[in-house]
């Protein structure tokens, strides 16, 4: 066992710079490629296909999206390609400043009858929605958004794409890897472990790797929380109507999650909290801000706009 382990350690030591550069390039390239080439990938994943055919974007949704772009003041040279998605929330990817542009998936439920029709079967997590039940009626009501709430949901995606924060997220992993490697090598030299026993060096490297992952997880979650909070505040600041739509959007989102919690039974209790937030999948991490926190933030902004003297 010592032979292969020594050979592996010697190989890593001999090619450590190349391995580091290759690993950093891979950690940056894989997530960023999703946004550099969004047109075929995102539409293939999220396109709404009623009756086996991709649904074209209806004129009313196209008009709604163009209105959002005008409200935000997006330059005419930025490229956006909206399409109809089967999801209940908008999806987006890409860089609007680049030639490939950005894509934004607009939920078919924004039209109302396409998905919310009680004669149209909907399966969620393996459970067919019973629209006649109280929870089914609540879910149906949560999918019916006002024009202001729809505009808030779309504007939030456009603001995110215009900010190019995707590149910052993609840079975080390689930056943490390079930082962990540099600090680990420096600590080995400082403590005199570089020429010490291999077992001791391996143990130190393992501790450094764990510390690096913890730093990455904390940085990733903190950045995500900051971006989500900024997106809500930036979108709500467009006007009082957008802020009001944001409050409705998150209220309907929480109401829909509570309906799903009831419809899915025990599976729903594992997915959603009694307040409608998503149950964290990791014990020591909260990857996203709770929806209640985001709703309260937008609600506070809306109240401040209605009563500027009290803000």
Curated annotation (Swiss-Prot):
Record topology, Mitochondrial intermembrane segments: 39-166, 219-311
GO cellular component, one term: mitochondrion
Keywords: Membrane, Mitochondrion, Mitochondrion inner membrane, Transmembrane, Transmembrane helix
Transmembrane segments: 18-38, 167-187, 198-218
Entry superkingdom: Eukaryota
Subcellular location: Mitochondrion inner membrane
Principal subcellular localisation of the protein: mitochondrion
Membrane topology term: Multi-pass membrane protein
Topology Mitochondrial matrix: residue spans: 1-17, 188-197
Xref: InterPro entries: TMEM177
Family named by the database record: Belongs to the TMEM177 family.
Known partners and oligomeric status: Found in a complex with COX20, COA6, MT-CO2/COX2, COX18, SCO1 and SCO2. Interacts with COX20. Interacts with COX1, MT-CO2/COX2, SCO1 and SCO2 in a COX20-dependent manner.
Function field: Plays a role in the early steps of cytochrome c oxidase subunit II (MT-CO2/COX2) maturation and is required for the stabilization of COX20 and the newly synthesized MT-CO2/COX2 protein.
Protein name listed in UniProt: Transmembrane protein 177
């Amino acid at each position: 066992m010592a032979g292969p382990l020594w050979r592996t350690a010697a190989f890593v030591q001999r090619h450590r710079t190349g391995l580091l550069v290759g690993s950093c390039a891979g950690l940056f390239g894989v997530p960023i490629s999703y946004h550099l080439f969004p047109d075929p990938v995102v539409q293939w994943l999220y396109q709404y296909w009623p009756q086996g055919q991709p649904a074209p974007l209806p004129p009313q949704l196209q008009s709604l999206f163009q209105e959002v772009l005008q409200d935000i003041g997006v330059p005419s040279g930025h490229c956006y390609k909206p399409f109809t998605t089967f999801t209940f929330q908008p999806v987006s990817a890409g860089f609007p400043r680049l030639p490939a542009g950005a894509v934004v998936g607009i939920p078919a439920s924004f039209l109302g009858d396409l998905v919310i029709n009680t004669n149209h079967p909907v399966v969620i997590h393996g459970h067919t929605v019973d629209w006649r039940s109280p929870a089914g009626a609540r879910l149906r009501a949560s999918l019916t958004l006002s024009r202001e709430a729809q505009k808030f949901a779309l504007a939030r995606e456009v603001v995110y794409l215009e900010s190019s924060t995707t590149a910052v997220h993609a840079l975080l992993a390689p930056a943490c890897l390079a930082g962990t490697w540099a600090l680990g090598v420096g600590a080995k030299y400082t403590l005199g472990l570089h020429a010490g026993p291999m077992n001791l060096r391996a143990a130190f490297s393992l501790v450094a790797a764990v510390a690096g992952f913890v730093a990455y997880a904390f940085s990733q979650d903190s950045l995500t929380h900051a971006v989500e909070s900024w997106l809500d505040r930036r979108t709500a600041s467009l006007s009082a109507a957008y802020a009001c739509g944001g409050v409705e959007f998150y209220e309907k989102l929480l109401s829909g999650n509570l309906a799903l919690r009831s419809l899915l039974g025990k599976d729903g209790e594992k997915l959603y909290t009694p307040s409608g937030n998503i149950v964290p999948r990791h014990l020591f991490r909260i990857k996203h801000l709770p929806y209640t926190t985001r709703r309260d933030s937008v609600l506070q902004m809306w109240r401040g706009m209605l009563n500027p003297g009290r803000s």
